[in-house]
Amino acid sequence: MNTDSYVQFFRQTSPYIHAHRGKTFVIALGGDAIAHGNCHRTLHDIALLQSLGIRLVLIHGARPQIDKRLALSSIDTSFAQQLRITDSEAMLCVKEAVGSTRLIIESELSMGLPNSPMHGAQLTVVGGNFMAAKPVGVRNGIDFQNTGEVRRIDADAIEQQLVLGSMVLMSPIGFSPTGESFNLNYQDVAAHVAIALDAEKLILVSQAGGIMTDGNLLRNLSLPEVNRLKENSTNGSEQSLLACAYRACNNGVDRVHLVSCAEDGALLSELFTREGSGTLIMKDHSEVIRPATIDDVGGILDLISPLEDQQVLVKRSRELLETEISRFMVVVHPEGL
């Protein structure tokens, strides 16, 4: 990127930087994303978000890592209703896999080598018993044993860490009041955390990325569209992503983003460009048309200047626009700020 392009790009991202600063984002990083070769870049981009003043809670998955650990121990497990049936023997492998995966994430976020994206970052990553879990129990005649689900999120404790400027890292293992350990679905944890914190965004990062139809990326989805796709999908991973997004968005989370871990820079592109890179899900993504105000003058000038340079429009001064602002209407895009 040459200097002029870099300066232009930086200027274009500045409204997003201002808008995101101080906001709470919950990021769900799938085990497949952690196993992907682009993982270290994704984690460095997450660290960059923290340095820009975004309050982050990162929840990681570990399904491929658990599968590998189980295979090494010659332990077979089965799935039902998209959940792993976890017996006591398998639970030991789950703890080992989740623990080692968490250490990989923490080590990447602790880097600070000169001439690296992490130089000078000095992130504080914290963990704790921020949630209580309960057993899934018996469903449709199937005993899920040590597989659990979220009972409660301690939003106040998480908020205290965010106020201190820490990044909160949560793993998909929860504990009951009696000290039992349960294997949890990381997407379910992420949805519960985002809802409890009243987060502005829930971002699901996985190899699946955005939702595709006939080879085309669906950039925006409403809740009814998400529900319809979820019911009709035959892809388990896609169903899981859509179910998580639907639950979060239907319970107060403003926006849910589905982002690919395989595309370098996809997370930053999704958050800091108008086009994005994945699928954005909102409760209502209709456009709003309203009368322009004096505060819109700068934005209108930015929009019409290229057309004035091409002599498509007659050139207007700022003073003239301010005088005639009542004659203008603006279309507010949901993807806009």
Model-predicted regions and their roles:
Residues 1-58:
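N-terminal glycine-/serine-/threonine-rich phosphate-binding loop
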Residues 71-169:
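Ligand-binding beta-strand-loop-alpha-helix segment within the catalytic cores
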Residues 197-215, 258-259:
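Glycine-rich phosphate/pyrophosphate-binding loops
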Residues 308-334:
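Active-site rim helix/loop that mediates acceptor-substrate recognition in acyltransferases
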